[in-house]
Regions:
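Metallocofactor- and cofactor-centric catalytic cores in central/energy metabolism, strongly enriched
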Residues: 1-204, 214-220, 243-245, 339-398
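An acidic- and aromatic-residue-enriched active-site/binding cleft used to recognize and process polar
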Residues: 13, 156-158, 208-211, 233-234, ...
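Glycine-rich beta-alpha junction loops
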Residues: 14, 62-65, 235-236, 259-266, ...
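Acidic, His- and aromatic-enriched active-site or binding-groove loops in soluble protein domains
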Residues: 177-184, 224-237
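Glycine- and other small-residue-rich loops at beta-strand/loop junctions that grip anionic moieties
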Residues: 185, 206-209, 231-233, 258, ...
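Short glycine/serine/threonine/alanine-rich loop segments
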Residues: 200-201, 225-226, 252-253
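Conserved anion/nucleotide-ligand pocket segment
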Residues: 229-231, 235-299
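Glycine-rich, aromatic-lined ligand/substrate-binding cores of catalytic
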Residues: 297-304, 308-365
Length: 398
């Protein structure tokens, strides 16, 4: 549909991943960039009625006071990404979309994230119910003001600490009773998720945070006939693991140990410097080797905050494996990339595919998006090639 208008609502709007995705969308709209690094620009997807850049309107929530222009200029200064002329050319669009961003919430987001908040409105509501109602009011206003056909809520905020789920999360009735009793039983990521899904809007979790990955939220997805997916975008070291581990399995090498050491210095790195937040990230990074090879080698993942690296991250992996006649050998690789540049195109891919699925009337977890995530909801398969085959089969089927 040529005149379709869709909303992309980003949780963590002023962050590096979000701002880079928005700059990319604005540049694409002006024919200032091509489709390099966007999966949905491959010929496989040509026959799908995916949204082009002209269809999108952007908004979001954030707990900090900033703007899309400030965020991309900051990345340009600190990490030497983007061309200054590109930012200037897209500035009017960034300012227009930035006007749609509203104050987020730090309720139950954890101490490390709360320290980042400098917007006083981020701490206004004191119960999950009040926060959910405020988020819903923002989403409804965004949709109405911009005359949007659809709104997708996509979480690209900082990683929350692990959140223990209990009996109140196991069904919608139990969850709603706890919510009405004003209990603080969900983290901020799940408040955004519940708010969106309850309005029938798709919700995607690009972070390791809880989001919609509990039974009551998934029941609500079915009840409201919408879609969800995630978790934790797969952009760097874990992507390499999901590509290399199948090679070891298919060549029948036995992996003895796999050690991955990660260093980076952006705001996400600062949050992950907190041991509680780091635990959430390590859980999603350290699970796939065993699933792919069918046994459990010794594994270790470390994440360290190195301030001077800014948005550039380095992963060094050491793989000790056994070959023919019991001979032990070693493979090492170094992955160096710009965190936001790696993640942003996937945000646009996921947005296009999710909006497409929602328009088709699909309901539930979007399993076909597994190749984009470290911990894909509804999918136990971690082999990247098997995951991508799921996406190929979906595209050919529809």
């Amino acid at each position: 549909m040529k005149n379709r208008r869709v909303g992309l609502w980003l949780i963590g709007a002023w962050g590096g991943v979000s701002a880079t995705a928005v700059l990319g969308l604005a540049a694409w709209k002006r024919n200032l960039t091509d489709g390099t690094s966007m999966v949905t620009m491959l010929p496989l997807f040509d026959a799908l009625d995916l949204d082009g850049p002209d269809a999108f309107v952007v908004g979001g929530h954030d707990i900090r006071q900033s703007s899309f222009v400030d965020a991309v200029q900051d990345l340009h200064r600190r990490s030497n990404v983007f061309d200054a002329s590109l930012i200037d050319a897209c500035k009017p669009q960034l300012e227009e979309w930035g006007a749609n961003v509203r104050p987020g919430t730090i309720l139950n987001a954890g101490a490390a994230i709360a320290k980042l908040a400098d917007n006083p409105e981020a701490n206004l509501a004191d119960t999950p119910r009040a926060v959910i109602e405020r988020i819903q009011a923002d989403l409804q206003k965004f949709k109405a003001d911009n005359k949007l056909d659809q709104v997708l809520v996509l979480n690209v905020s900082s990683t929350e600490p692990p959140f223990a789920i209990g009996e109140s999360h196991q069904s919608m009735p139990k969850f709603l009773r706890a919510l009405e009793a004003r209990q603080n039983m969900i983290p901020a990521s799940s408040m955004y998720a519940w708010a969106a899904i309850d309005l029938g809007m798709p919700y995607i979790n690009f972070t390791p945070s809880l989001g919609a990955s509990f039974v009551a939220a998934l029941e609500l997805v079915q009840e409201r006939k919408t879609v969800t997916g995630g978790k934790d975008g797969k952009t760097g070291e874990t992507l390499m693991k999901s590509v290399l581990a199948p090679m070891f399995a298919l060549r029948n090498f036995r992996i003895l140990s796999w050690v991955g050491h990660n260093i980076f210095g952006n705001r996400d790195g600062l949050v992950l410097d907190d041991p509680a937040n780091k635990e959430s990230k390590i859980r999603t990074k350290d699970q796939l080797i065993q699933q792919i090879v069918g046994y459990k080698p010794q594994t270790h993942v470390s994440i360290e905050y190195i301030e001077s690296l800014d948005d550039w991250k380095t992963a060094w992996d050491h793989i000790h494996f056994q070959g023919f006649l019991g001979t032990k050998m070693i493979m090492q690789f170094i992955w160096q990339g710009c965190d936001s540049i790696l993640a942003a195109p996937l945000v646009l891919d996921i947005a296009r595919l999710t909006l497409f699925a929602h328009r088709r009337g699909e309901v539930g977890v979007l399993r076909q998006l597994a190749c984009f995530f470290k911990s894909p909801m509804g999918v136990e398969e971690h082999d990247f090639f098997e995951q991508f085959r799921m996406l190929e089969e979906y595209v050919r089927a529809v």
